[in-house]
Amino acid sequence: MVKKIHFVMERHASIVAFLLAVLALTESQAFTSVKLPRDEHWPYNYVSVGPAGVWAVNRQNKLFYRTGTYGDNANMGSGWQFKQDGVGQVDVGKDKVGYINLSGGSLFRIEGISQANPVGGTPKSWEWWTKYIGMSLREDTRFSSRIENQNKVLTFTFRTCFWASRITNWCFADSSYTETVTAGGSGTWITKSQLKYKSGTFGNPDTEGGDWILVDSGSFQHVSSGSGVVLAVRSNGELVQRTGITCSLPQGTGWTSMLNSMSRVDTYGTVAWAVDTAGDLYFINL
């Protein structure tokens, strides 16, 4: 009888260990990635995905729209349509795209983007002295965030005033050195070597939120907030996904490693796009 009990216990322990191993394997392989073939526009610097499709900037500072991706984020698309020269960084919003012009660090936005016209109209000047833009996914661009030339994060208030095509009332959201900012379904996050989350923005990033919460004191170079998912690139190039994100714990609990030698990432819906250090693009199903 004692031997039988020990056998049953050992058998259950083996089953539990096997299930845990399968679960760990499933978590580590819960995504698929496709490395896009190099084309005449390679190498690339930035890529962004959103309701207005996939947009990328190559190392010649040319801005392109990925054909066939407007309103269909799960579609990898095919080929590129040229839009603009002299672009440093791009971020996709809802039927709008924001980008940084390298000449003077000016911020521009492209409006009028639609299924019939996925590259939109003529870019409009939006703001000067900008290093980075994080577009809102709302129709109302007042809730976007930007990093100005002194590396401070600025966002809009609800009382933002419009004058012609310019928006005139930005407010400080973080006054210390900041590298990247993102606003998505999992809230507003920033990298300033360390990684921080703005409390009160989970599920509704278009609010001013509360205090910044330190998530990870490690060194990060990029972050992207999506619907229930946060992806980040460490300074060593490791692409990681934040685990344990819930409504009650929006900053999550840990990390899952995905890819190496990455430099930028952006996520929307069930997919992500990334750029590696060689300038190659990756399409990732989450």
Curated annotation (Swiss-Prot):
Signal peptide (UniProt feature, chain positions): 1-30
Predominant location: secreted
This protein's UniProt keywords: Disulfide bond, Enterotoxin, Glycoprotein, Hemagglutinin, Lectin, Lipoprotein, Membrane, Neurotoxin, Secreted, Signal, Storage protein, Target cell membrane, Target membrane, Toxin
One GO cellular component term noted in the UniProt record for this chain: membrane
Tissue: Produced by albumen secretory cells. Found in developing eggs.
Glycan-bearing residues: 101
UniProt feature coiled coil, ranges: none
Cell compartments where the protein resides: Secreted; Target cell membrane
SMART domains: TECPR
UniProt modification remark: PV2 is a very high density lipoprotein (VHDL). It contains 3.75% of lipids. The major lipid classes are free sterols and phospholipids and also have significant quantities of energy-providing triacylglycerides and free fatty acids.
GO molecular-function term, one example from the UniProt record: nutrient reservoir activity
InterPro entries assigned: Beta-propeller_rpt_TECPR, Tectonin_beta-propeller
Protein family membership: Belongs to the tectonin family.
Known role: The egg defensive protein perivitellin-2 is a pore-forming two-subunit glycoprotein that affects both the nervous and digestive systems of mammals. In addition, it is a source of both structural and energetic molecules during embryonic development. The tachylectin subunit (31 kDa) binds target membranes while the MACPF subunit (67 kDa) disrupts lipid bilayers forming large pores (inner diameter of about 5.6 nm) altering the plasma membrance conductance.
Protein name according to UniProt: Perivitellin-2 31 kDa subunit
